[in-house]
Amino acid sequence: MEPLKTHTGTIAVLDRVNVDTDQIIPKQFLKRVERTGFGQFLFFDWRFLPNGEDNPDFELNQPHAKQGTILVAGHNFGCGSSREHAPWAIKDYGFRVVIAPSFADIFYNNCFKNGILPVKLKQEEVTALMEKGKDTAYSLTVNLEAQTVTSEDGFEATFEIDGYWKEMLINGWDEIGLTLRYEEQIKQFEASRV
């Protein structure tokens, strides 16, 4: 995985609550196990009209949101069935950070495992970001090392994160990569047991 220490990008506002994994990536697109190629299906039923054209009313189809790399959403984001395809689609679409007041637990952990930083901010902070970014391009800097979210206009917030996940993202490790860091010690242990 690519390390994540600091990320600066434009926000895309999804002012909806209880966005479940079926809405993030609909079931008809779950027939593959590769981690790439799912971004084109992200929020498919909202992003596209029945004829396949972009839905002009959908938040992420607005010109200022199309280049967003930080998704700002409502509470309980990622609820519903457990599917790792949901963070795969979010990352493949181009989001590196998701900010919300709360996340479903399994989705929250799956984000870390796939190189996405889920940031929990207070409801009033998320509401302020939504107001700032709903109609215009609005840039944020998320500093994982300092655990801050800031902007040039003075917005500033802090967030909590488990030390394990923080270290994993900062170093760009997934669980397999972390295990491989101890490959020599594992071999020595195995040799001592023969």
Curated annotation (Swiss-Prot):
Swiss-Prot/TrEMBL keywords:
Amino-acid biosynthesis, Branched-chain amino acid biosynthesis, Leucine biosynthesis, Lyase
At the top level, the lineage of the source is Bacteria
Q: Which molecular function terms from Gene Ontology are attached?
A: 3-isopropylmalate dehydratase activity
Question: What catalytic reaction does the record list?
Answer: (2R,3S)-3-isopropylmalate = (2S)-2-isopropylmalate
Q: Which GO terms describe its biological process?
A: L-leucine biosynthetic process
E.C. number(s) listed in UniProt: 4.2.1.33
Q: How does it assemble?
A: Heterodimer of LeuC and LeuD.
Q: What PANTHER family does the database record attribute to this sequence?
A: 3-ISOPROPYLMALATE DEHYDRATASE SMALL SUBUNIT, 3-ISOPROPYLMALATE DEHYDRATASE SMALL SUBUNIT 2-RELATED-RELATED
This chain's protein is named 3-isopropylmalate dehydratase small subunit
